[in-house]
Structure formats: C-alpha cells, structure tokens
Amino acid sequence: MTEKTTKSKNSIATKNIVRVSLICFLLVFSVTVPFVFSPVSNASGQTTTLVDGFEDGTLSPWQTFQSFSVNTNNPYKGDYSAVANSDDNTIFVTTNNDQYTAATVAVNIKDSNNNARILFQDRPDSNNADLLANIYIESGNVGFYGGNGQDTGIDISYSEWVVFEIKNIDYSNQKYDIEVYDKSGNSLGSFSGADFYDSVSSMNGVDIYKVDSGSRVDHFTTGEFVSKSTVSGNVTDLEGNPMANATVTADSVSTTTDDNGSYSIKLADGTYDITANKKNYKPQTKQIEVNGSAKTVDFSLGKIEKQLSIEGPNFVRPNQTIPYKVEYTNETGTYDVSNYSNITSANTTLLSIDETNKTLLAGGQNATVKVTAKYNTTEVTTNVTKQYYVSYLKLENIDTVPPAKWMQAFLGFDDGYAENKNMKGIGSDIQWLLFTVIIMSTIAKLFDNPWAGIGSGVITGVLLWVLEYIGLGLLLSMVFFGIFIGLILVRVRRDGGNEVTINES
C-alpha cells in the first residue's frame, strides 16, 4: 500500500490547542497494521527522551512505503508507547510536553535496507514546524543528518540500546542539546548548542540498549524525571599515570575509565560516596555533593602491597591459634592468600609459610595454607572472610621439639607453681591429680626454671612410665616413704624449643 494515513497539522493548530503539545509517531511498514498507542495521563517529567525499542536487535521488520500517524491532544508528561499488533517491535517516547511548552517528538521509522530514521520536530501547534533533529540508524551506525547536507554519526552495535535525549530547546535562538545514555543512565556522548535541523558533531562508542523480550509493549515506569548533573574526572596511579579500565561507582551507577583514565557519569542531586577501583590497587572513596552543577572528582590509586602479618607467641606449640592476616584484594572480590612478598613474623621464629602454595579464592571460600613449625609442615584450612583477610589459623597437630608425645605435665611451670593441676595425656586423671596435689610444691620449687615459657612443661622420666603401669597404689607408697625424689628425671622445655634434662638425686 502506498497511501499514507496522516492527520493534518491544520487540524491540530486550532485555538483550543494552540498551547498544547502533542506526540506524533510516524511508523512505516510494508503492510497496514493497527497500532496500540497509550499516553500515560498525568505522569510527570522534565525532559524529552526517546527510546528506540527494536527488541530483536535488528531493523529488518520495518519496511517503507506505508506510514501511520497516531496523535493525541492530551500529551501529559510521561511515557508513551506505540506497537504494531502483529509485530513485537515497539517505539517509546518519554516527553516533557505539557499544556504550555515543549516540542513534538515525531518518530519516522523506515527500513528496506536496514535503515531507520528518528525525526524530532518543534512547535506542533504551528503550521510551520521546524525539524529539530534527524537521527538515523544505518549499517550499524547512528548519525545526525543536518540540513546543510553534512553527515556525522555515532558508532554503535545492535547488542544494546541507547536513550536519545533532546533537551534545553531554545526557540528564540533555534538551539537544542542532545545527549545519549546507556541503560544505566551513564552518558555516552553529548552535543550542546545544535542548530535546528543542522549537523551535530559525532559521538563515538555508543551501544544500543536491547530491552527485555517477552512483551510487545515494554513497561517504562512513569514518574518524575530527575534532573542529573555530570560528575567527571581522571583516575591515575600515585605517579600520575592514567589508569584505563578502572571502575568508578556511585550507588548503582558505574562506568569505566577510557585509555586516558577519564570517566563521566550522570547523578541526580544528593550526597554520594563515589569509589574508584582497579585490580591490584587500593580502592579510593570520596564523598561528593551533587546540586545541579557539574563536578570534577579525581582519584589517585596506590598499589596494594601483598604482605602477610603474623602475630603470635614466641614459639609454636600444638593446637595453638595464630592470627594470620593477608591484605590483598581487588574489585572482583578475590583474595590472594599466599602471593605475598614480605612476611612479618613477630617473635615467631619457628613459624614459616609456604610461599609456593599459591591460592586465589573468592570471599566466603576456604583457603588452605601450609604452615611449618620447626621442621614439620601442616596444612591449615580457614575461611576467607568478606573483610578481605584470612584470620586465626588454628595449627592442628604441629610437631614440636621435643615431639608432641612429650606434652607438658605441668602448664606454666615458670614461677614455682604448676598452673594446670589437672594433668592430661599420660596416666589416669586421678593419678595425675593426686601426683600434682602432693608433689606440686616440691617439684615446682626445685626445678623451676626462669627461662621456661608460660606454655612450658615438666615431664617425668622413668618414674612416670612406671607410674603409668603400676597404678595408684605404688604411687601412694612412694609418696608415703618419700623415695620418689631420687628417681625423678625432669625434662623442661620451651614451647617448640630445645629440651633441657635435669637429674636430681
């Protein structure tokens, strides 16, 4: 069909609607199909925004030689949609049209060769409406066609859609501004002071936003359009070198820096914590106040020093808990628990970490670290917390010198008293309890050694093994006759340290 169905502009230009703006959609198809057009009454807004909504990412369904006009005399601010009933492709316009001022947005889609055009007209109440802008999509590019024949454009792909915003329309000087946003509201390019129906400078790097499929009419939330201001700046390292591909985030708005380390985002008025982050660098956060004007916020990121800090007692003993902290992370939330360049072992001379055990884990997972106490190695598994560190590795069954079977009979034998009276490990509890109560003061005072650590021990020699097998009766007899002192061989050790043998007769 070749006959165009349009509504005369003369019918619009009546006294009743002289100051009323209207929305005009010109959609072009190869066949005549009805449209669903639904203006949103009383939705508020402050700008003119057009979203082109080819859900399937191609322009092939649109054809030339047939046009339709759908008009409304009640163009409240808000969201509008037009969709062919037999097609899933939808055109959306969000406009600031009210009963007093604004431009008409006319959408004219044509595609016989994968081409499309989006027309913006001003003064719908006038028979002499001017064309504000002619945005076209052709062979993978979005361009702006000017009345002087110049042809400039934006490089795009069909993977995503963009939002075109025509704003700040100045009828007196016949100027307007245009800006292109991605689906998150980040500015992809802009031009200020464009002449009506004149060429617009090119903008690069725009991806088209592909809306969710499954519905013929996309559901844009109506509501007040929030004025946004541009926040831009540069991200460098501490030497001032630009950092490309750094992430800059403020609330849910995020972008990455270009090759020059520059970024730009749009934010509504308010207070924000804006953060710059890049792998292997410490994030930097600044608080800013957005109040309707452009702001510049620069960042300087320092390299993360991959250091391990160990804080513990003088020596390692079995079942000891040692705080273990690794400060190394990046913006993806992964933590390297072993790739460090410096070990700080504060007074932990017999403890070392196996640096060859490289492990890269995400937060919340378990990290396995090899820990060596003296000459023996154990593997310790701990949780990588969301606070970016691994903490409190419990060293289970670390062999010590002397061996662990010589575990202390008295704990804290360093001040003349056995601090743990309930002996464990060798002999029954009752034997050791009685042994401790009776001879504690004698042995402790005789063999106290001032250099013994709090965790040092006293291990009896031959007599101890005899007591294990002959039982409580012989112990009582030996205590009663006082003959045990000459038989006791006492080994006193420092935790993980050398053994000292003391013979008393």
Swiss-Prot record:
Domain of life assignment: Viruses
Source species: His1 virus (isolate Australia/Victoria) (His1V)
Ranges where the record places region Hydrophobic: 20-40, 423-443, 470-490
GO molecular function, one term: metallocarboxypeptidase activity
Note: The virion does not contain any lipid membrane.
SUPFAM superfamilies, sorted: Carboxypeptidase regulatory domain-like (SSF49464)
The keyword Cell wall biogenesis/degradation belongs to this UniProt entry's keyword annotation: no
Full protein name: Structural protein 27
Predominant cellular place of this UniProt entry's protein: virion
Cytoplasm recorded as keyword: no
Location of the protein in the cell: Virion
Gene Ontology biological process terms, A to Z: peptide metabolic process; protein processing
GO CC terms, sorted: extracellular space; virion component
Keywords in alphabetical order: Virion
